[in-house]
Amino acid sequence: MLLSTFPALRASFFALPPSLRRACYATATATSHPEIFDLASTKGLKIALIDAQSLAAPSRTGNADAGGTREFANRCSSLTPASVKFLKRIGAWENVEQGRVQAYTGMEVWDGVSGAKINFDPLDRGRVAGVVESLGRLVPGSALGKSVGEEGGGEVATMCENANLTSALVERVSGFEGVEVLDGMKVEGIELGPEKEKDGMSLDLSLWPVLRLPGDRRIAARLLVGADGANSPVRTFADIPSKGWDYNQHGVVATLQLDQLHDASAPRKAYQRFLPTGPIALLPLPGNKATLVWSTTSALASHLKSLPAAEFTAAVNAAFRLLTTDVSYMLTHSTASQDLDWRESQTDLSALGLPSDFPRVEGVVEGSVASFPLRMRHASTYTGHRIALIGDAAHTIHPLAGQGLNLGLSDAESLALQLATGMEAGMDIGSCWCLDGYGSDRWGKNNAVMGVVDKVGKVFGASAGPVVWARSAGFRVIEGMGWVKGGLMRGASG
């Protein structure tokens, strides 16, 4: 069973072979005892899909505007080609509303202090593809010969609203017989089940996790998968410690309207500028819309959320277009559009590193500005007795690289493969023998990505002269080496 508000966990069900999906359907005991499920998950086998929020189709996207067109939601994710390939393989991607997703093939990143920049484009992927395939010919039978084209169509990533992906996964899972979707239902508690001798049970549940649901319903799980977020009750129940820290920052998100109306077939770019207070990113959505992710101090995040729409728009333009000293001044004094225009007229935008094709932000969708705290957390292990952690319950990462959901989807794929292997061998899916391979596969990989992202954030948050000089020099070196940029793009694309 899966209790799920987390897309990656729902995805794990589809990654199982059909014969094993059927094998995972649960049987219920007498009503006085807990219902027994092979797999239960917070945040997709009998399969109970439990979510505290409604998963009905209308929640797929944002509210409608005055003309009846549905606005884009402010919570979007950047899906790598590897993640999209996985979603296609499990049959979920075909349910995604394609008119509301946007692939991008390039990305420009620049230093807000020095103006040094890196321009990632499809040509860089082609250069590294040539190097990789040449090496593959020198090492017959190795994975080096794998073509870049096998991973995707040249895109860096694809933007998709979280609600769009969630609805697609729910639509997919609802097509299977024996699946029970329990949305709008909150888990009230987790406890160990009763002993066979004391409760007249045919099965000893004393070491099984039992979920308490509204209406005195109880569910016992042979395996409980926790994908219930950074403050995971499943992780707490399993007494699995985690290490990490808060960044004392918030990620401000919003849906923006740009001055450029893009043709659906035109190539799109993402943009990211590293400011001393944190990175700000503009990621493309269809048409003239984009999603904003601005990592900044908690105080500034509160200030930004309090601004009227016109002043918020001016603040976003300033953060991309002005010197960092001017950005700081405008965010603490005035963000009037006329002040922005005057300061921009006095700024050498090319020396600033601003891309020549960078769009101007014309407005912000009403009600779309929000924020969330930024933190890094990593569980000491992903598994316990009849417990597996996945996604944010296992690891929380800074959003500057947009890898959070992608890591979670990779977790889901790995866990599903491990369960399929164990079930084919006749293993108890809640046993350490079945689960250990999942933790061994994912913990080190996730830890490496988290470490790199954390260090990149700290390097770009430093304002000391030697650090600024060193990172700027690094930018310029990488910008001049196409095959290095291509390698970075391949890594970021999964």
Please report, for each region that a protein language model flagged, where it lies by residue.
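N-terminal glycine-rich dinucleotide-binding loop that anchors FAD/FMN and/or NAD(P) in oxidoreductases
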Residues: 64-98
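Glycine-rich FAD pyrophosphate-binding loop
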Residues: 36-75
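N-terminal mitochondrial targeting presequence
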Residues: 1-33
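FAD-binding beta-loop-beta segment adjacent to the flavin cofactor pocket
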Residues: 371-389, 447-448, 458, 464-468
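Conserved N-terminal helical subregion
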Residues: 99-238, 243-255
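Glycine-rich phosphate/pyrophosphate-binding beta-alpha loops
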Residues: 279, 372-379, 394-406, 444, ...
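C-terminal helical "tail/cap" subdomain of flavin- and related membrane-associated enzymes
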Residues: 417-494
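Conserved FAD-binding catalytic core of PHBH/FMO-like flavoproteins
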Residues: 87, 210-218, 222-358, 366-369
